[in-house]
Amino acid sequence: MVMGLGLFLLVFMLGLGLTPPTLAQDNSRYRDFLTKHYDATPQGRNDRYCESMMRRRGLTSPCKDINTFIHGNSRHIKAICGDENGNPYGENLRISKSPFQVTTCNLRGGSSRPPCRYRATAGFRNIVVACENDLPVHLDQSIFRP
């Protein structure tokens, strides 16, 4: 009996290691994406905005070289991962069909140690994301399309 139970537990534990990521893990990666790249209603979109947002989002220890914040509706961002607002782009990426209002924060100076100083560039861009289970999990780039 003990031998059978031990074998069952061994097989069960091995099975856990081979299962695909759970929905909770996928949602965690999506939440990380939102934390790094989403700000629905920005208060200003200047250098001070970048310095404040980068600090509040935990992207300044060390100073991140570049980060883009996407503004607007999160449903439209999620829709890039489907046909509603996205098209295939390269290998395993999707590009938005419509442009988004974005603010890109570029690190000024060469040091990656705080205090971090950023230069803001605001505009409308199509965005390229990697998706997992129909959720954006990585912002690859933003593209200006005239």
Curated annotation (Swiss-Prot):
The protein's superkingdom reads: Eukaryota
The answer to keyword ATP-binding applying to this record is no
Modulation of this protein's activity: Has weak tRNA ribonuclease activity by itself due to partial autoinhibition by its C-terminus, which folds into a short alpha-helix that partially occludes the substrate-binding site. In absence of stress, the ribonuclease activity is inhibited by RNH1 in the cytoplasm. In response to stress, dissociates from RNH1 in the cytoplasm and associates with cytoplasmic ribosomes with vacant A-sites: ribosomes directly activate the tRNA ribonuclease activity of ANG by refolding the C-terminal alpha-helix. In response to stress, the angiogenic activity of ANG is inhibited by RNH1 in the nucleus.
Cite the Pfam families for this sequence. RnaseA
**Please, one GO biological process term?**
negative regulation of translation in response to stress
Q: Motif Nucleolar localization signal, which positions?
A: 55-59
**Entries under SUPFAM superfamilies matching the protein:** RNase A-like
Keywords associated with the record: Angiogenesis, Cytoplasm, Developmental protein, Differentiation, Disulfide bond, DNA-binding, Endonuclease, Hydrolase, Nuclease, Nucleus, Protein synthesis inhibitor, Pyrrolidone carboxylic acid, Secreted, Signal, Stress response
Q: Could you say which enzyme class this protein belongs to?
A: hydrolase
Q: Which positions form S-S bridges?
A: C50-C105, C63-C116, C81-C131
The UniProt record gives the binding positions of tRNA as R45, C105, I127
Does the record bear Signal in its keywords?
Answer: yes
Q: What are the recorded GO MF terms, alphabetically?
A: actin binding; copper ion binding; DNA binding; endonuclease activity; heparin binding; protein homodimerization activity; RNA nuclease activity; signaling receptor binding
InterPro entries with a match to the protein in the record: RNaseA, RNaseA-like_dom_sf, RNaseA_AS, RNaseA_domain
Query: Where is the protein localized?
Result: Secreted; Nucleus; Nucleus, Nucleolus; Cytoplasm, Stress granule
Active site per UniProt? H37 (proton acceptor), H138 (proton donor)
EC number assigned by the record:
3.1.27.-
Pyrrolidone carboxylic acid PTM positions read: Q25
- Give the family per the record: Belongs to the pancreatic ribonuclease family.
| Function in brief | Secreted ribonuclease that can either promote or restrict cell proliferation of target cells, depending on the context. Endocytosed in target cells via its receptor PLXNB2 and translocates to the cytoplasm or nucleus. Under stress conditions, localizes to the cytoplasm and promotes the assembly of stress granules (SGs): specifically cleaves a subset of tRNAs within anticodon loops to produce tRNA-derived stress-induced fragments (tiRNAs), resulting in translation repression and inhibition of cell proliferation. tiRNas also prevent formation of apoptosome, thereby promoting cell survival.
Q: Oligomeric state and partners?
A: Homodimer. Interacts with RNH1; inhibiting ANG ribonuclease activity. Interacts with PCNA.
- Kindly provide the name given to this protein in its UniProt entry: Angiogenin
Organism name? Rhinopithecus bieti (Black snub-nosed monkey)
